């Protein structure tokens, strides 16, 4: 082949490659256009679909890739990452009693039986009074309303307590004592989940139950680490066992993990703060789907078997009604 023929052939191949890439991008955008439109029409701000770490679709109705949005109770997805980081650093185990850290509980015959695992699962029996104070002192003094391990309660008390447990363990180990700063510098920064903003209680503790602000890409990276059970770039940076437990239900509630809602059938009536149709019989959610859910339709969906992480953020925590079942049906239709 002479030089001219070679150059013409190379140019043709380059043109084909470029047009193939453009076609693939166009098809990907078109594939999820209906889901993106559904989100945007309901005050959506961001929409992101990631499969096996590869972005399949990304759309912003407001802001951009680095814009942080308040995710409300979707913040709870960071609690299992905090727990898994502490376990990986050998600062705690899931089966140790809470009383090993909160010493005042040791003398209580019921509270002394509550393990970290039971606390994180929401089955400790501890919950704040509806119109009462929600500070640390109140949380520590709470008495279980039910026998630990028997009933689930969708309440912020376990998050307040676990933040204090983390603070005490980090202080004892001479590590960064602030749980949010520890998690951010140790785990979130390496995976690209920054910048992230935290709200705090009147005691100064970071709130892991509500109030974080993060970008769509950052939240997706956190979800990807959970989906991969703590492995990042071939390194185990957070405990696989702890993150595996975070995506399993308990005897008390099969639809609740550690800060995550799980697809499946419950054995009791719904008594949850979050509004969702995820568990309707018509829902297309796969059996292994996990979801972090904030007010206003702030959502992080994880589907491990499909390798999927999906983020949907709204402009406010009071946005229009949101249907998980309808949104997921649009996603799965286009996969």
Please name every model-derived segment.
Residues 158-166, 210-232, 298-313:
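Active-site-proximal alpha-helical segments within enzyme catalytic domains
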């Amino acid at each position: 082949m002479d030089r001219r023929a070679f150059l013409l052939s190379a140019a043709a191949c380059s043109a084909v490659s470029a047009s193939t890439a453009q076609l693939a991008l166009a098809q990907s955008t078109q594939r999820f256009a209906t889901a993106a439109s559904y989100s945007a029409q309901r005050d959506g701000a961001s929409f992101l679909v990631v499969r096996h770490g590869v972005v399949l679709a990304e759309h912003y109705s407001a802001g951009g890739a680095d814009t942080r949005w308040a995710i409300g109770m979707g913040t709870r997805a960071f609690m299992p990452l905090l727990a898994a980081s502490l376990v990986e650093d050998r600062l705690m185990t899931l089966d140790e009693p809470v009383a090993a850290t909160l010493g005042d509980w040791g003398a209580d015959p019921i509270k002394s039986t509550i393990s970290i695992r039971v606390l994180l699962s929401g089955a400790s029996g501890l919950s704040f009074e509806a119109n009462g104070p929600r500070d640390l002192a109140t949380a520590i003094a709470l008495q279980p309303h039910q026998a630990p391990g028997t009933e689930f309660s969708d309440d912020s008390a376990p998050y307040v307590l676990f933040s204090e447990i983390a603070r005490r363990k980090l202080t004892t180990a001479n590590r960064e004592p602030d749980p949010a700063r520890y998690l951010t510098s140790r785990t979130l920064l390496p995976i690209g989940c920054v910048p992230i903003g935290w709200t705090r209680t009147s005691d100064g503790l970071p709130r892991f139950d509500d109030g974080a602000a993060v970008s769509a890409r950052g939240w997706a990276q956190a979800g990807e680490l959970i989906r991969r059970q703590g492995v990042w770039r071939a390194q185990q940076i957070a405990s696989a066992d702890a993150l595996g437990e975070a995506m399993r239900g308990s005897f008390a509630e099969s639809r609740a993990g550690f800060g995550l809602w799980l697809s499946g059938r419950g054995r009791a009536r719904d008594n949850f703060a979050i509004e969702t149709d995820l568990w309707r019989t018509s829902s297309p959610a796969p059996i292994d789907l996990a979801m972090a859910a904030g007010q206003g339709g702030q959502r992080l969906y994880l589907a491990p078997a499909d390798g999927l992480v999906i983020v949907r953020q709204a402009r406010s925590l009071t946005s229009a009604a949101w249907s998980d079942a309808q949104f997921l049906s649009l996603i799965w239709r286009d996969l």
